């Protein structure tokens, strides 16, 4: 007995954190079994600065309503829960692995697919649960997505369909390894799952773990294990060492800088603008929510302090959208804590990403695919490391059987392995002659000679002060000359007449 233990907690910041959590999340609710925690760590040391939750801790035999013996911030082995699904905050670990593989932020991936075959996802982990098979269906929040999207924008806007494509091009086991290099593990002690949907955040992880992981990215790729004790003084006044700082490099500084770039844009113009403090201290971050919105997250970091905020269901699956202001509470708490952290610690800018990790190993889609035969296009695209798929036929003036269109614009920087769908010409469109300025009869003759017979006249009466010499002249045509149309297309010629009958 008689030991004095000096913790790493910053009591002023802890008070601000506890105040923000308690102000915004009650100890109990009639709507759901609501819980919340906010925890912060010091970047570069791992020192735990705050650990605040909505329910007071009470591990006695007679806890009051609204109290708990569970620390929501930590792993189960430390008196914590079994963690909570982290949602899209986990995408950052796929981003890190993407960059570790030399891929680029500006590489474009397919964001148009909402069902994938899980057998297409490589997973070399023996204990991840694979191999995988069967369909995987998913959706995007708020209708986000599209045919083509850069990895940068996919991160900023947290697009599930794009990240499914990213994961499809990676080893799921290596995504797990990237997470583990930043100290990420399941709160219940089981191995991180590596099923394809894990990239969207199905693993249950403690908030303290997520805060420390993001601190590692903010620290230039050097991760520090969280520690809680600075020093100990015994009964005789002898000072003993506290927990030793345990830091290790998780990724190169270049990869960390590249990962931080879209994470900064998440705050300034992406899904976490509500967490933007606007005090001039740069912050990187990522939002997270589960499909049913029963768990919500905001995790972010300056160069000095990282904070993770979780608000959601302690038990149950009630959507936070059913709770007043439910989706925004995490941002209110995060802003309040980080505003105080910035006042105390400040924080500098993040390094710019290297140019090599902007383009990565992407390839620009050649324009000359258009007009090729299917065989030529397939050979060219597959030779570039892309996948080839025929997406059907279209009306086109190109020779029948030639490639008439692609699912991505020519010049797009595509990630290797991306499927390019081509459309094939039916060869049934021809260029419509321009007959404006000709006499109507001459115009009809010219169109007939070109193969067009479905022609009608629209009369435009010449005004009294007009030129009667324009009688019978074609002044407009629809479609316009030069348009690519079918032979049977209806063509309307506008003709000047002295009198329209």
List PLM regions with ranges.
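A penicillin-recognizing enzyme superfamily signal
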Residues: 7-27, 38, 51-54, 59-86, ...
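Short, charged, amphipathic alpha-helices and their helix-cap/turn boundaries
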Residues: 170-187
């Amino acid at each position: 007995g008689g030991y004095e233990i000096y913790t790493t907690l910053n009591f002023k910041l802890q008070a601000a954190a506890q105040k923000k959590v308690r102000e915004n999340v009650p100890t109990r609710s009639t709507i759901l079994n609501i819980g919340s925690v906010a925890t912060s760590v010091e970047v570069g040391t791992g020192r735990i600065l705050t650990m605040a939750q909505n329910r007071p801790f009470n591990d006695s035999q007679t806890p009051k309503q609204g109290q708990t013996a569970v620390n929501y911030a930590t792993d189960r082995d430390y008196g914590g829960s079994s963690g909570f699904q982290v949602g899209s905050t986990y995408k950052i670990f796929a981003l890190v692995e993407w960059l570790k593989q030399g891929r680029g932020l500006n590489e474009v991936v397919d964001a148009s697919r909402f069902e994938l075959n899980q057998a297409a996802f490589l997973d070399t982990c023996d204990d991840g649960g694979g191999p995988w098979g069967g369909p995987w269906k998913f959706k995007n929040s708020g209708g986000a997505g599209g045919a083509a999207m850069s990895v940068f924008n996919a991160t900023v806007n947290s697009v599930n369909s794009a990240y499914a494509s990213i994961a499809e091009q990676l080893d799921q086991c290596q995504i797990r390894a990237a997470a583990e290099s930043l100290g990420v593990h399941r709160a219940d002690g089981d191995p991180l799952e590596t099923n394809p949907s894990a990239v969207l955040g199905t693993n249950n992880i403690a908030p303290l773990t997520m805060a420390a992981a993001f601190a590692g990215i903010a620290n230039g790729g050097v991760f520090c294990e969280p520690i809680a004790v600075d020093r100990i003084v015994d009964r005789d006044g002898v000072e003993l060492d506290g927990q030793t700082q345990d830091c290790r490099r998780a990724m190169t500084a270049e990869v960390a800088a590249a990962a931080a770039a879209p994470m900064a844009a998440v705050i300034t113009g992406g899904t976490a603008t509500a967490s933007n403090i606007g005090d001039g201290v740069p912050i990187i971050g990522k939002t997270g929510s589960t499909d049913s919105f029963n768990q919500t997250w905001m995790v972010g970091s300056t160069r000095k302090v990282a904070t993770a905020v979780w608000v959601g269901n302690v038990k149950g699956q009630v959507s936070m959208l059913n709770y007043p202001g439910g989706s925004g509470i995490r941002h209110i708490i995060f802003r309040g804590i980080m505003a105080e952290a910035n006042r105390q610690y400040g924080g500098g800018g993040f390094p710019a990403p290297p140019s090599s990790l902007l383009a990565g190993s992407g390839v620009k889609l050649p324009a000359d695919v258009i007009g090729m035969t299917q065989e030529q296009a397939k050979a060219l695209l597959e030779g570039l490391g892309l996948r080839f798929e025929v997406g059907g036929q279209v009306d086109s003036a190109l020779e029948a059987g030639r490639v008439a269109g692609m699912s991505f614009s020519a010049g797009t920087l595509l990630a290797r392995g991306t499927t390019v769908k081509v459309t094939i010409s039916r060869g049934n469109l021809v260029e419509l002659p321009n007959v404006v300025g000709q006499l109507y009869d001459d115009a009809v003759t010219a169109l007939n000679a070109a193969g067009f017979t479905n022609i009608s006249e629209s009369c435009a009466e010449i005004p009294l002060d007009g030129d009667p010499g324009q009688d019978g002249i074609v002044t407009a045509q629809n479609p316009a000359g030069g348009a690519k149309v079918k032979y049977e297309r209806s063509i309307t010629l506008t003709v000047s007449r002295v009198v329209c009958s």
